[in-house]
Structure formats: C-alpha cells, structure tokens
Curated annotation (Swiss-Prot):
This is Uterine plasmin/trypsin inhibitor. One of its GO terms (cellular component) is extracellular space. Residues 38-88 form the BPTI/Kunitz inhibitor domain. SMART domains: KU. Residues 21-29 form a propeptide. One of its GO terms (molecular function) is serine-type endopeptidase inhibitor activity. The lineage of its organism: Eukaryota, Metazoa, Chordata, Craniata, Vertebrata. Inhibitor of plasmin and trypsin. Also has a weak affinity for chymotrypsin. Could serve to neutralize the activities of one or more serine proteinases generated by the proliferating trophoblast during the formation of the noninvasive placenta. CDD domains: Kunitz_BPTI (cd22592). Residues 1-20 form the signal peptide. It holds the Pfam family Kunitz_BPTI. It comes from the Eukaryota. Keywords: Disulfide bond, Protease inhibitor, Serine protease inhibitor, Signal. Expressed only in the uterus and the endometrium.
Length: 122
C-alpha cells in the first residue's frame, strides 16, 4: 500500500513539474483560444447613437469595425482595434504580432526536451 501511495505522490509531483516548465506559457495560451465572448457577433444595441467600435470576428480571425448604438453593449465591443486584438487574438498575443493564425506554418508547442507535437493553427 505504501508503494502505491509513493507512486501516486511521484506521479503528482512529475505532473506539477511538467505543468510549470518554463516556456510552457505560450503553449497554454495558444491552446486556450480566445474567451467565449470573442465568438459572439457584433451587437449594436437598442440605442441610436453612432459610435465606431471593434469586434473580434472569430471566422476571419480579425478585429473589424461596427456601429455601436451607445447602450447595452456586450463584451465583444472594443474602443479600438488594439484592445480587441489584445483581448481576443491569442495568436497575436502568443507570437507578438497581429493577424490570424490560419496562414501560420506548423508550430511546435513543446516543453524543452520533449518530443515535438506540432499542429496547424487556424
């Protein structure tokens, strides 16, 4: 029984070490994807003002402008394109640039010393 407990403890410790490997933050960020509200369509709202705002278009992977009525806005509603990209474009956050991931080459997201696990983003 004590060997079983020791084995379980070692497995938990190994899992914790792997999860905290330096450089793994990018892997987690790329896999996590944007927040759920970034997939919502733009919402003008019931008011009749005309403010230019930006929303993240999950289909194209770009931030696009739309007209916001001024009240009851939803979360996919940003003052400028930079804020939109920072919040919703996980590819841009991970790679330090803007644009979508669809045209990116295969990218490895492995902790140092592990076998390559590549996948195509987008």
């Amino acid at each position: 029984m004590s060997r079983l407990c020791l084995s379980a403890a070692l497995l938990l410790l190994l899992g914790a070490l792997v999860a905290s490997t330096p450089g793994d933050e990018e892997s987690s960020l790329v896999r996590a994807g944007p927040p759920g509200f970034c997939r919502e369509p733009p919402y003008t709202g019931p008011c009749s003002a005309h403010f230019v705002r930006y929303f993240y278009n999950a289909t194209t992977g770009l931030c696009q402008s739309f007209v916001y009525g001024g009240c009851r806005g939803k979360q996919n509603n940003f003052m400028d394109e930079k804020e939109c990209l920072h919040t919703c474009d996980t590819c841009a956050k991970a790679q330090g640039k803007r644009g979508n991931c669809a045209s990116e080459m295969l990218k490895s997201t492995r902790p140092q010393g592990w076998a390559v696990a590549a996948f195509q983003m987008g």
